[in-house]
Amino acid sequence: MALTLEALVARFGGEIVGDGRREVGGLAPLDQAGPQHLAFLANPKYLAQVETTAAGAVLIAPRDLEKLGAAANGRNFIITPNPYAYFARVAQMFIDLAAPQRAAGVHPSATIDPAAQVAASAVIGPHVSVEAGAVIGERVQLDANVFVGRGTRIGDDSHLYPNVTIYHGCTLGPRAIVHSGAVIGSDGFGFAPDFVGEGDARTGAWVKIPQVGGVKVGPDVEIGANTTIDRGAMADTVIDECVKIDNLVQIGHNCRIGAYTVIAGCAGIAGSTTIGKHCMIGGAVGVAGHVTLGDYVIVTAKSGVSKSLPKAGIYTSAFPAVEHGDWNKSAALVRNLDKLRDRIKALETALAAREGDAGGA
């Protein structure tokens, strides 16, 4: 389905430069776009591609359009302060327009407990299981093999992809998106040590601590594939509104993730940690338990956070990749830092003594 630039601006805002009646039916990168495409410029380093693109129109920021000068003549633009966000909204609109509309109802192979509440507008796919007391909101889509435990509530307009598991006593706010393989509400990692003795004579066991809290997920949250969010030990684990979580992320019990925070793939957040709002957690970051990250904290990829970071800012502890030989040299220096420290201390002591003798003379 093609739409005019005028129709796009009427829906999403912006200012047209060029032919507002130009139709576009999809999006493409600047260097691959054709006359039927809408492209966008989010990074000024690609400004030269705007001069050569075949795109029917380009989303562009005012400052970048000014830089084009005469090269902009004869081209069509939608001017917007944030072309990247504009592109995302238009892309979602085209996907929604093209997506086949699934009829509301329950697949014959699904298992719905009579004590569950399922909205008439919901779409329940093959082999879905919904336990007693669960509430499935309006226009919710549960794809094949989704499991919803007893007493769990799924908010309106949410979409759970195939093989998602939501344990008992959890809440997902409206417009939640949960991708395949995610598990929400599994037991937190809680065990009390009960051992006596030392060494090989040590006896006893790890005593499991019942995890009786739940998980509360706010509105407009997206959770990636194979991500796991543990239920609280006593209080709930809380994911606030508009949090975006990538694939393969582990969030421990009793954590609280603040609104609009984003967490990249393979990050691990240990239990009882609080992360503020508008934070950015890079890929493979590890955060220790019982620490607090303040609002607007950014932790770069592969960093380890072992203590609280209350102040907004960018934090890094990862060592960037270098050539193997250079790494070996650096590692050798690190191994000998204690010896170098002792030598420097000895030199400083000798120098101070010599200066003292010279002053006395």
UniProtKB/Swiss-Prot annotation:
The record's disulfide annotation reads: none
Which range is the signal sequence, renumbered to this chain?
Answer: none
* InterPro entries documented for this protein: Hexapep, Hexapep_transf_CS, LpxD, Trimer_LpxA-like_sf, UDP_GlcNAc_AcTrfase_non-rep
Part of which pathway? Bacterial outer membrane biogenesis; LPS lipid A biosynthesis
Q: Which UniProt keywords apply?
A: Acyltransferase, Lipid A biosynthesis, Lipid biosynthesis, Lipid metabolism, Repeat, Transferase
Enzyme Commission code:
2.3.1.191
Q: Which residues form the active site?
A: H253
Bilayer-spanning residue ranges: none
Give the reactions, separated by semicolons, that this protein catalyses.
a UDP-3-O-[(3R)-3-hydroxyacyl]-alpha-D-glucosamine + a (3R)-hydroxyacyl-[ACP] = a UDP-2-N,3-O-bis[(3R)-3-hydroxyacyl]-alpha-D-glucosamine + holo-[ACP] + H(+)
Any single GO CC term annotated in Swiss-Prot or TrEMBL for this entry: membrane
Supply the Pfam families for this chain. Answer: Hexapep, Hexapep_2, LpxD
- GO molecular function terms noted in the UniProt entry: N-acyltransferase activity
List GO BP terms, alphabetically: lipid A biosynthetic process
Q: Which domain of life is it from?
A: Bacteria
Family, similarity comment: Belongs to the transferase hexapeptide repeat family. LpxD subfamily.
Q: Mind telling me which NCBIfam families this protein's record contains?
A: lipid_A_lpxD, PRK00892.1
Q: How does it assemble?
A: Homotrimer.
Q: What does this protein do?
A: Catalyzes the N-acylation of UDP-3-O-acylglucosamine using 3-hydroxyacyl-ACP as the acyl donor. Is involved in the biosynthesis of lipid A, a phosphorylated glycolipid that anchors the lipopolysaccharide to the outer membrane of the cell.
Q: What is the protein named?
A: UDP-3-O-acylglucosamine N-acyltransferase
Which species is this UniProt entry from? Burkholderia thailandensis (strain ATCC 700388 / DSM 13276 / CCUG 48851 / CIP 106301 / E264)
